[in-house]
Amino acid sequence: MPKISISTLRWPVALATALALLGGPAAHAMKLKQQNLTQLIADSQSIIAGKVTRVTDGVAPNGMPYTEITVSVADSAKGELRGGAKYTFRQFGLLKPRKMPNGSTLAAVTPEGFPNWKVGEQFVAFMYKPASRTGLQTTAGLAQGKLNVLDGRIQNEFNNRGLFDGVKIPDGLLSAKEREMLSSKGAVDAATFVGLVGRAVTGNWIATGEMR
């Protein structure tokens, strides 16, 4: 029987140690905290819309398992990335267990609660800053901060659960569609969502207290 490099008993401990090194939202992966839209905007270094073009995985020289994602950026609401750019980042964890040269199996797959990335999917992502010690990166709020776009509708892996809970914006700043969206459940109109996020960032609503 092949050896498993991280056993069933040791895996939670090894995972917790690795996530602690990543910092930011990854450090809370073992106890995923619900975050709403205001928190996702505030915690993100960049907010991008685009398409996933490549997904691979590997093990870094320091032994850290990663999934490498390349995206084509269509638009950006926050940060230095611009439409037309290609962006590549690495997220903690493998796509699937990997057979190592010594015959053991590295079972450090992407942890539950992290976003999944698939070639061809369109998305809006609230990207947290890269971890200072490892360079690994994921989304603010983990899977809450990556929303897939399909047939003009947008939702995250939790069907937008809690995304608008507690979000407060003066009615005078909102369109009728935006007011309806903030009180809705499940997938919402992608154009309305992206438009609201863009105006919130451009208008600096969170810093001015207009969005809470």
Regions found by a protein language model. Name each.
Residues 12-23:
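Bacterial N-terminal signal peptides
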Residues 50-52:
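Conserved hydrophobic positions within beta-strands
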Residues 55-60, 78-79:
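Short, conserved beta-turn/loop elements at beta-strand boundaries and strand-helix junctions
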Residues 27-36:
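Cleaved targeting-peptide boundary
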Residues 59-71:
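Short aromatic-glycine-enriched beta-strand elements
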Residues 28, 102-212:
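Netrin-like (NTR/C345C) domain of secreted extracellular proteins
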Residues 2-14:
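Bacterial N-terminal signal peptides that target proteins for export
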Residues 84-111:
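Beta-strand/loop nucleic-acid-binding surfaces
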